[in-house]
Amino acid sequence: HPMRYVQPGTLPPDYETGIAAVNEKLAADGVDIKVEIIRIPWGEYDTKLNLMLSSGEPFELLHVMQDVKNMSALAAMGAIVSVDPYLDKYPELVGMFTETEWLGSLYNGEHYAIPCSWRSFDNLMSYMNVRVDVMKAVGYDEFPSGSVDDVIDLMKKSQEYILNETGIKAYNWFHQNQDTAHWLHRTYDSYPFYVENSLGLVLARQDGTIDSFYESEEFKNDCETYYEMYQAGLVNPDVLNIDHSVMYDDAQLGAFLPSQTFDPATGVTIQQKTGINTTVEWVEMNPEKPEMICTFVQNLNAISDTSEDMESGLKFLNWLYASKENHDLFHYGIEGVHYNPVGENRIEYIKDENDNTLYTMDTWMSGYLPFMRFSSDAPDTQIDYMTYKAENAVVSPIAGFIFDASNVQTELSNLQTEIIASIYPIKVGMVSYEDNIDQAIANLKAAGLDTYLNEYRTQFSAYLEANPWVLEMAK
């Protein structure tokens, strides 16, 4: 049976050799499927995927990203099917994931995907990464986690230092423009609370109250801080228009300010590319406050409604996670040809003449943390970051809730457009909150904000009623 697996991105140079070895091993293990990876380039991902789904193109497995096109949206349009009828046959696969990870794959009371457990989500949202050498050079022995004013001062001094060092003006970045300033939220008296990250419309309080984030005091505070930062030149003036790759290109040369993106491995890249002796560490405001667990799972793999055999995808995942050997083969290729293992959990990739890794499959789509290998030059802090388990954490009541937007499709698409037009310029500090928020909220309301939030509250109330443990867990 074919096992066509649709993912975003592009295939590695030596894909054919690697996947042939995977199929050989599957055959030797008596698994009657033939794996083929179908990649859709990021730039065309939304359009191409929608086209595949609407035309009924046959494939077996779909990678689902909750922050791009979430599982409930795919399930609501009938693109993926419930896996519950088949799970009894795969007890080992079921046992690989925690109860909370499985909660993250529920839609209308049924499991619609297999979780991908590639990292801990205990520290997903509110961290910043900072160049420690620069921080110390400009007079801060440690990250000033108790004061936003000091963080801004650190950013200003770091910007000047990095400009002298690299000739590049460094900026504070969001991971994506849609993101919320979660790092600031830890400094507010109303914390813990969580703002849903894909649109930022929903502010969820720990008691289950759903507030309108863009109409909240918290959003006002975020904007006032970012206005100060933008006016001080700490945010790229072209942030809403430039290609996102610019931020990574600059960061790899050492030019970034404390930001809610990047990771400790960035420090290694900077050293390799520039020779600057630096380390990058993850920090947060008010570390004594609890972590916010805001999702049980961020990536999943689902069975396509157009699958030739509904179990091919499950057979593949069951085989993939059955051993570290299978996991190594699929993700890293043939030992000695595509990679060399370094100890139990490190790896050296073999590259082609253009310095491209010959063969690798992204672990964030199909990896399993206990089996994953990290680059031999990745700092220990990177592994700590990926595997971190919080001692002190609260779980957001919306962590396991997946909103089904099918009743508010029109409002949703109008709001998506309007948020970019009216909210982004205020959020990144380009224009002042005071002068622009009333018009922005009026525009959101015209686009259907209240209808959207009412639908969200209705579904969320039903979810709380069906799952009374949620608010207990959120205490």
Where is each model-derived feature located?
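Extracytoplasmic/secretory soluble proteins
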Residues: 1-475
